Design a protein with these regions (language model features):
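Short aromatic/hydrophobic contact patches that present stacked aromatics
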Residues: 8, 87-91, 122-124
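A short beta-loop-alpha structural element at the N-terminal edge
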Residues: 8-20
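Conserved GNAT-fold acetyl-CoA-binding loop/helix
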Residues: 21-48
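Acetyl-CoA-dependent GNAT
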Residues: 38-95, 106-107, 112, 116
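Conserved catalytic-core motifs of GNAT/GCN5-like acyltransferases
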Residues: 72-75, 124-126, 132-133, 141, ...
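Conserved acetyl-CoA-binding loop-helix of GNAT-fold acetyltransferases
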Residues: 98-114, 138-142, 146
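Conserved GNAT acetyl-CoA-binding A-motif
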Residues: 113-135
């Protein structure tokens, strides 16, 4: 990626599954943040994208035609009163983190949600109990705090 290039953000399609799964896989295999133990198949991942797109935006960020991140939302709760609240998910390729791209992707997702009348974005994130370790860091917590999220609750010592 060159200094002059700007990322593009577009709506994902199920055809993006292989590229987005390549971004997601290291998070499943090398961290504790996804709460998944097994990497989904490309077919399953494509199905997840399609299911999300039935109701919500699923965005992909590209640099020079290469997917470098994605963001989507899912229902926070199945009850009707929660229809205006969503859970956000955002993933970036490890080689582009900490460069402001997460903010751009998050802001694009937020604008889509505002246009839909969705007023409450929540992030359920895993954080280490004390110090960072090889599987879990405070990066997501710090990012979300920087984006204006605030801690409203914690599940302590649960799996």
């Amino acid at each position: 990626m060159t200094e002059m290039s700007e990322p593009t953000i577009r709506l994902a399609t199920p055809d993006d599954a292989p590229a987005l799964l390549a971004i997601y896989e290291p998070y499943v295999l090398e961290t504790a943040i996804t709460c998944e133990y097994k990497v989904p198949s490309v077919e399953e991942f494509a199905g997840r994208i399609a299911k999300t797109l039935e109701r919500y935006p699923y965005l992909v960020m590209e640099f020079d035609g290469r997917a470098v991140g994605y963001a989507y939302v899912s229902p926070l709760n199945s009850r009707e009163a929660y229809d205006w609240s969503v859970e956000t998910s955002i993933y970036l390729s490890r080689d582009v983190r900490h460069g402001g791209l997460g903010r751009k992707l998050h802001d694009a997702l937020k604008q889509c949600l505002i246009a839909m009348g969705i007023t409450n974005m929540c992030a359920l994130i895993a954080v280490p109990h004390d110090e960072d370790d090889e599987y879990l860091t405070h990066n997501s917590q710090d990012f979300h705090a920087h984006m204006g999220y605030r801690l409203v609750g914690a599940f302590d010592r649960c799996a």
